[in-house]
Amino acid sequence: TRHSIRSKMGWNGKFVIGHAGRFTEQKNHKFMVEIFAKVHEKYPEAILAFAGDGHLMDEVKAQVKELGLTDSVQFLGVRFDMNELMQGMDIFLFPSLYEGLGNVITEAQAVGLRSIASDVVPNEVKMTELVDFISLNKSADFWADAILKYKDGYIHKSRHDDLKKAGYEIKSAARDLEKYYLELVGRKM
């Protein structure tokens, strides 16, 4: 799947930094573009792939154009194949300004994709060694260097067992939910 996705998306021979999320202030796309500009300056074979849409997309596209990065940034729109796309990516970038949980980080870990997220994302999302947290107070250059540590290839490996141990497995989640409901019903009787 990785090779076919990379071929289909034009990612062969590239270092692909991905993101999925609505184009809103919360997701911090403008900072992502600043980070990517620093990455691209140091490693021109990098590509930034955005999945999603939202009211700030045009502003982000204008920023990309202004920085001369149009040929290296892809706007993929709303996607229903993120699992496959993530398998073709090399790293997932998530510098949110605030976040409830950040479920997309869980999805990235499930396919073995390393993620670099802001330290406002709750620690509970880290179920494997594949998540690094960085302060939003750090510069775009600092973030770029953290990303580039992984440019020489990370082997995607299923993290199903890690996720299962962390409680993200449908059968155990269903049992936990059933137990919770039974406790609630028991209290009302």
Identify the function of each model-found stretch:
Residues 15, 19-38, 55-61:
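A conserved mid-protein helix/loop that constitutes part of the nucleotide-sugar donor-binding site
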Residues 1-10:
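A short helix/loop element that forms part of the nucleotide-sugar donor recognition site in Leloir-type
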Residues 78, 97:
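Aromatic "clamp/platform" in nucleotide-sugar-dependent glycosyltransferases that forms part
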Residues 17, 32-33, 48, 143, ...:
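A structural motif in glycosyltransferase catalytic domains
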Residues 154-189:
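A charged, aromatic-enriched C-terminal amphipathic alpha-helix characteristic of glycosyltransferases
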Residues 105, 114-118:
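Short hydrophobic beta-strand element within catalytic cores of glycosyltransferases
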Residues 61-77:
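Nucleotide-activated donor-binding/catalytic signature segment of Leloir-type glycosyltransferases, i.e.
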